[in-house]
Amino acid sequence: MSEKEKSSTTTSSVIDEFGFPAEVIQILDRTGVTGEVTQVRVRVLEGRDKGRILTRNVKGPVRLGDILILRETEREARKLSTKR
């Protein structure tokens, strides 16, 4: 088995076991009753949706450039709206 085949099977097993890696490219806003959730834009790094940009809600501390592991890439967070 060549090095390229080994790395591709390793990558696919990581995706199957854990999820899809995505890099935080923009922090949008805080949401939740007490502001405990941060809405961010992420770029999917591997998998069938490689390069796709999603809006997701993240609980816990997050910074630009962080790598998140997404269990799936189909769902996207709703846009925040102000209620008056």
UniProtKB/Swiss-Prot annotation:
InterPro entries per UniProt: NA-bd_OB-fold, Ribosomal_eS28, Ribosomal_eS28_CS
PROSITE patterns on file: RIBOSOMAL_S28E (PS00961)
Molecular function terms from GO: structural constituent of ribosome
Source organism phylogeny: Archaea, Thermoproteota, Thermoprotei, Sulfolobales, Sulfolobaceae
Keywords: Ribonucleoprotein, Ribosomal protein
UniProt key word rRNA-binding: no
Any one GO CC term of the record: cytosolic small ribosomal subunit
Gene name as annotated: rps28e
SUPFAM superfamilies: Nucleic acid-binding proteins
Species name: Sulfolobus acidocaldarius (strain ATCC 33909 / DSM 639 / JCM 8929 / NBRC 15157 / NCIMB 11770)
Keyword field contains Ribosomal protein: yes
GO terms (BP aspect): maturation of SSU-rRNA; ribosomal small subunit assembly; translation
Protein name: Small ribosomal subunit protein eS28
A Pfam match: Ribosomal_S28e
Family stated for the protein in its record: Belongs to the eukaryotic ribosomal protein eS28 family.
